[in-house]
Curated annotation (Swiss-Prot):
Transmembrane segments: none annotated. This is Terminal nucleotidyltransferase 5A. Disruption phenotype: Homozygous mice lacking Tent5a have slightly decreased survival, probably due to perinatal or embryonic lethality, since the effect is already visible at postnatal day 6 (P6). Mutant mice have an abnormal posture with frequent kyphosis and a wavy tail. Mutant mice exhibit frequent bone fractures and newborn mice reveal rib fractures. Adult mutant mice show decreased cartilage ossification of the tail. InterPro entries: TET5. GO terms for biological process: positive regulation of bone mineralization; positive regulation of osteoblast differentiation; regulation of ossification; response to bacterium. It comes from Mus musculus (Mouse). It is an enzyme of class 2 (transferase). Expressed in primary osteoblasts derived from neonatal calvaria and osteocytes. Strongly expressed in calvaria and femur. It catalyses: RNA(n) + ATP = RNA(n)-3'-adenine ribonucleotide + diphosphate. Belongs to the TENT family. GO terms for molecular function: poly(A) RNA polymerase activity.
Amino acid sequence: MHQRYFWTDQGQVAFGGHYMAEGEGYFAMAEDELTGGPYIPLGGDFGGGGSSFGDRCSDYCESPTAHCNVLNWEQVQRLDGILSETIPIHGRGNFPTLELQPSLIVKVVRRRLEEKGIGVRDVRLNGSAASHVLHQDSGLGYKDLDLIFCADLRGEEEFQTVKDVVLDCLLDFLPEGVNKEKITPLTLKEAYVQKMVKVCNDSDRWSLISLSNNSGKNVELKFVDSLRRQFEFSVDSFQIKLDSLLLFYECSENPMTETFHPTIIGESVYGDFHEAFDHLCNKIIATRNPEEIRGGGLLKYCNLLVRGFRPASEEIKTLQRYMCSRFFIDFSDIGEQQRKLESYLQNHFVGLEDRKYDYLMTLHGVVNESTVCLMGHERRQTLNLITMLAIRVLADQNVIPNVANVTCYYQPAPYVADANFSNYYIAQVQPVFTCQQQTYSTWLPCN
């Protein structure tokens, strides 16, 4: 058997045979020629020590700038844990639960898209999960698993193909014994899809398919051709390129170690990677071009405040005004505002119900202080809505706030329904402030 050794000082190793780490670099030991196989960059010990978070990625990043950085071994392990974890996708009604591994769904979806003629440039982990990989103790936590497929979506046909492919892939994850013949794409959509979004205009071309999980850990598959604004704040601007790790899963016969693992690139679409990473570690709120942030940015901003993040400077007051204005542009109707707030509370506070009240009071304070685009009655209407939701949260938790700040709601007596009776007084809703964490077993007097 003819063996050849390929030395790489940049970590380029051809898969197709056996591999070993040796000395200050890597040897690839192949049974045949090294040419013709897939190539993957390897991280590890290029100079006698383990890879550090400060390694530059000029040899691997598409645009070698300060936007990119190489993940260290600890971060690679966290990423591997996320992609290898089995996540249940819960079906509605009598549909069975799907056991879905992120790395596997990415592999299946990508392969079928390419079979249909839709090229996938790369796949990335995005959002809070990417931030968690980079810094585990950031305080952000993560729920949704946001996976981005950078794909070519030229027209309506490609968007429809993406939808069909994802729904068809779900059939592969149904438990054995399930009769798949009569299950239609529409049935799968109703059973397993939390939401679908399609945006197609001059600046943005992307679609989102969110697979539902009862604990809020949805798997979100996002297919992006172009997207003008990819982040809201620096701490959620991170994306991790998964291609080298996915190729390692597919090709390597040996497990990863500290000295033998693929080189994985992290990128900050905010700008300077180290600046954004410093914001993440020190819980700093910063952004660029705040006028581009959509209406949901206000809700994310208040969530960061509740989690202990603080503005980078006093100029954040201007940012608050931008975000309030945009929120009321995107959600101008009080009904839309209520649906958006209720949805946000439901999706972002799973297991954190005790923080909902503080969150709503923080939102109340920001809206009260920084809203300049509304008529007085519209502003009061929104503030009253936030207060009502806060009181509902307290009721759900069986907690009563400080007596001096309680708003009383009266149930009308039966005779009030009489058309001739008009002496009923509706109490004005007042803001609720910091909750004194006590419970009371009796009714309290009203001020």
